[in-house]
Amino acid sequence: MKTWEKNIRRVEPYVPGEQPKVKDVVKLNTNENPYPPTPKVHEAAERMNISDLRLYPDPEVTDLVHAIAAYYGMNDNQVFVGVGSDDVLSMCFLTFFNSDKPILFPNISYSFYSVWADLYRIPYEKQPLDKDFNIIPEDYYKENGGVVFPNPNAPTALYMELDKVEDIIKHNQDVVVIVDEAYIDFGGKSAMELVNKYENVLVVQTFSKSRSMAGMRIGYCFGNPELIKALNDVKFSFNSYTMNRTSISYGIESVNDKEYFEECVGKIVKTRENAKERLSQLGFSFPDSKANFIFATHKSVSAKEIFEKLICQIF
């Protein structure tokens, strides 16, 4: 074996959800929003000066950072923007998880966590959920190199109450705690209010689910200015121009249309609750979803059989 072959960093890659090449598919596997982005995005597209694409975008994403900060009542220096929440989370792993102690995350959770840990050679321990698929806060009170968990969790769709989230943060004030809130807009209370209370917490969110902009790749997080500066320092060490002009422009329009955002989220939540009722009548059981999907099982029909029948019906 050649020396370079021995030195290749080998990881088990994250497998993204299937993206069907055919049209007219009812696509459920990656939890995308069924509604289009705000009409203001379309208006922004019509106003866009194509000749501006010859210019590099703003490396600090100033206008989008300001729009996000203003919407959520934060300061600009408390906001970091990346190319989707995956990019933000990856930067967080690289920036803050550098201890020889293991980071902690749930054993049933977002599968990208272990991929990043392997890629960056970060030791980790997966913490089991309880019998009802809930995160057990006490499992995160032990010595560690950092903590990350989704809330609501994926794929369980279960929300952990904010007081329990705060308990985890309280017991880990010497390390960074990342709360991954990709689905928070569909239920529960954000941990954002804890950003001004604790110096070690980062709250990560995305435009992909509730804002109908998965194709634009916009993610962001909130944290104290020292953490945000560290993230920007690492980002600029890789690529100063991570966010393109189109995403910046469309992202600003999305943030500024609160009425449309709340309308779409409300419709999705109503559909979810109706689906729960219908699924129960059909013999399905599931945890109480606070996301835009339902983690369901059937007492007599296997998941494989359901999957195959849905595929046959172009789902």
What residue ranges belong to the model's regions?
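N-terminal "arm"/small-domain region of PLP-dependent enzymes with the aminotransferase-like
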Residues: 1-55, 143
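A general structural signal for well-ordered alpha-helical segments in protein cores
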Residues: 5, 38-42, 61-65, 89, ...
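Short aromatic/hydrophobic contact patches that present stacked aromatics
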Residues: 27, 148, 293-295
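Conserved core of the PLP fold type I
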Residues: 53-172, 183-198, 202
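Short beta-strand/loop segment that forms part of the nucleotide-sugar
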Residues: 177-182
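PLP-dependent aminotransferase class I/II
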Residues: 200-280, 284-287
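Conserved PLP-binding catalytic core of the aspartate aminotransferase-like
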Residues: 269, 281-310
